């Protein structure tokens, strides 16, 4: 029965592992957490029940690029009753999309948008059959001290009492189910496959300084194929992209300060192979579905094992052999520690907030949002727990740079998973084949990097 509909609606002969089990759970009315690896077709898990039940679906999504990609995918399948509203749109486009909300089958919104009362009023009477929390690990990873509105999503799901909740992610630490159940105030049926992407080999290189890293990188990208290079800051993003461009390769930049239109331009040029290399902060993360990315390089370490698996999961979505490579020099530990802990909210900040004493504006804003739903005692416990988890993630990522055991096993055991060793596994236990996918130099005349950026964005 389900396979017949799969063929009719999506043109597929069979489900990927985990898809059918998640769909069956949802169709039985169970609130469900689906943990499926990156690139395994998680969006089918909500599209299929939507067509089956003939009721509208609300998808709460963390990133604009992720929403746009899924809307584009649905429209390419012939679906016209799909709409999203986000901060990258101009007012006219927002108005047009608001006008068709009640006629739409798939509605994509951010938590910040939907939790504003005048926006919530636009959808509160829509009879949703399904409420989807996409990239659900973000509720646990981001939902307290980065995107605090995530921790209030339970207000939305509680309103739509007749809707089934479906949370989807590719990375699930052992505490994720209990975190989500606490936020949503429901019991979840957890269906978990593997987080392991066997077609992505893992390698790591240690250097004495950034100059050594850059020298290695400029040589390596000659044959790395379509490549994302992750860095820790906008400043390094611009500097590294400029060096790669001067080396002869058209290079895109992607960071949080770009406008929505600029991000779209870079993504489209990368997806359509006009540029072979993107240098990005983690803002590039989850939203681009380019299937033939061969290489993901972390010039700086990722902020957690969960983020690392998400970021390397951009590679090899066509099923072909791909590679994830991390680079490290001694100063990088300080960079990561600063990013993770310098502005982290701790229980002492909650006490200060409770007393009405001065706090930095960003911390005060976050605690003000969260205090709508949580007592001071609960907030102290939340941030104490969050700090301990960050410390554990930090130690695991730093440990990754020092180990001589299987890298895949070391990463996945953090999530309670014990993978079987595969060919092309990692540099510690396999003789990895070199991926030869040459990036042709395309810089014909010597534009400056700034001229190239101006041409790219037409400024």
Tell me what each language-model feature is.
Residues 2-45, 49-55, 60, 65-108, ...:
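Helicase motor core with emphasis on the C-terminal RecA-like subdomain
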Residues 228, 234-236, 249, 268-275, ...:
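C-terminal helicase lobe
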């Amino acid at each position: 029965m389900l396979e017949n509909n799969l063929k009719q609606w999506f043109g597929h002969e069979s489900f990927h592992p985990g898809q059918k089990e998640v769909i069956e759970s949802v169709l039985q009315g169970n609130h469900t957490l689906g943990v499926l690896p990156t690139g395994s077709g998680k969006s089918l898990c909500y599209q299929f029940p939507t067509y089956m039940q003939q009721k509208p679906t609300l998808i709460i999504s963390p990133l604009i690029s992720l929403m746009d990609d899924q809307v584009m995918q649905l429209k390419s399948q012939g679906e016209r009753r799909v709409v999203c509203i986000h901060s990258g749109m101009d007012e006219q486009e927002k108005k047009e999309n608001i006008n068709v909300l009640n006629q739409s089958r798939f509605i994509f919104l951010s938590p910040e948008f939907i939790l504003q009362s005048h926006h919530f009023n636009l959808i509160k009477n829509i009879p949703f059959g399904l409420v989807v929390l996409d990239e659900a690990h973000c509720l646990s990873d981001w939902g307290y001290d980065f995107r605090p509105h995530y921790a209030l999503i339970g207000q939305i799901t509680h309103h739509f009492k007749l809707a089934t909740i479906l949370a989807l992610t590719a990375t699930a630490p052992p505490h994720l189910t209990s975190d989500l159940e606490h936020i949503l105030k429901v019991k979840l049926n957890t269906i978990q496959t593997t987080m392991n992407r066997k077609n992505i080999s893992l390698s790591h290189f240690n250097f004495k300084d950034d100059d050594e890293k850059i020298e290695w990188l400029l040589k390596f990208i000659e044959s790395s194929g379509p490549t994302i290079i992750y860095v820790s800051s906008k400043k390094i993003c611009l500097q590294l992209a400029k060096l790669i461009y001067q080396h002869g390769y058209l290079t895109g930049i992607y960071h949080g300060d770009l406008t929505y239109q600029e991000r779209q331009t870079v993504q489209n040029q990368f997806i359509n192979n006009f540029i072979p290399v993107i240098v990005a902060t983690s803002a590039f993360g989850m939203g681009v579905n380019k299937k033939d990315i061969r290489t993901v390089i972390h010039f700086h370490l990722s902020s957690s094992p969960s983020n690392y698996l998400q970021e390397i999961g951009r590679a090899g979505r066509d099923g072909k052999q791909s590679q994830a490579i991390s680079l490290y020099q001694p100063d990088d530990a300080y960079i990561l520690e600063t990013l993770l802990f310098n502005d982290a909210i701790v229980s002492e900040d909650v006490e200060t907030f409770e007393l009405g004493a001065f706090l930095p504006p960003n911390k005060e804003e976050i605690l003000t949002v969260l205090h709508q739903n949580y007592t001071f005692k609960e907030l102290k416990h939340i941030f104490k727990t969050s700090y301990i988890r960050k410390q554990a993630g930090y130690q695991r990522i730093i440990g990754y740079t020092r180990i001589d055991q299987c890298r895949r096993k070391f990463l996945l055991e953090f999530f309670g998973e014990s993978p079987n060793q595969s060919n092309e596994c990692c540099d510690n236990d396999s003789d990895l084949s070199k991926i030869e996918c040459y990036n042709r130099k395309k810089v014909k005349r010597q534009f400056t990097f700034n001229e190239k950026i101006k041409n790219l964005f037409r400024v």
